[in-house]
A protein has these predicted regions:
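Active-site neighborhoods and metal-handling regions in enzymes and metal-associated proteins
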Residues: 1-201
């Protein structure tokens, strides 16, 4: 998943976003085929299903990664509560992500919080979760360090990291959040400005 696409984004909706695929990320999708799974498919977006929009912007050659959830009509309470849990995980990791904190410890904290929320089985992919919760971002979309299992990299001031906690519900869809942060002496400062709320149209 490293050094593949300079600019990128995908939109997936409902159960199609929750299908396993060859993706190295937490979401899958049917898309147009097995080699372009994280892409728009041919099904129409339905009411009351989550629409996940994951996209990258570039400013002066530096990338910023973010994900938002949209819906045509209100989502089920289960999905809304899971989305709120992912926001809480993101915000907690940003608060704890100070210089010297080891990336693997942040990953474990995210897993523990997902477990406490009753979402461990679906956290960061289903049926096989990916072993990370975030990644460096800069001139490339995916850079070091990785906030992942067994990663022992201490955070340093100035590192720029995308945190992306997500939950995959088979036959229902994907909810979660992603924002880009920069490590400061007191924690991670968020760079993206678009609201984290589910946007219901």
């Amino acid at each position: 998943g490293f050094n593949q696409l300079p600019l990128y984004g995908h939109i997936m909706a409902g159960r199609n976003a929750a299908l396993p695929s060859n993706s190295a990320g937490p979401t899958g999708g049917r898309g147009l085929g097995p080699f372009l799974s994280q892409s728009a498919g041919t099904d129409k977006i339905q009411k009351n299903e989550p629409i996940i929009v994951d996209y990258v912007a570039s400013v002066e050659a530096y990338n910023s990664d973010q994900t938002r959830i949209f819906a045509l009509g209100k989502l089920k309470d289960e999905l809304v509560k899971a989305h709120e849990a992912m926001r809480t995980i993101q915000n907690t990791l940003a608060e704890k992500g100070q210089p010297g904190v080891v990336t693997g410890d942040l990953y474990q904290l995210a897993l523990d919080m997902a477990q406490s929320a009753g979402l461990a089985e679906n956290f960061m992919g289903y049926p096989v979760p990916v072993p990370f919760i975030g990644h460096g971002v800069g001139l490339e979309l995916n850079e070091w360090p990785v906030i992942g299992r067994n990663m022992r990299v201490p955070l340093e001031v100035g590192m720029t990291i995308a945190l992306e906690p997500k939950v995959v519900f088979p036959d229902k869809g994907v909810v979660g959040i992603e924002n880009t942060f920069v490590v400061t002496p007191t924690g991670m400062e968020r760079l993206n400005r678009f609201p984290d709320d589910i946007i219901v149209c």
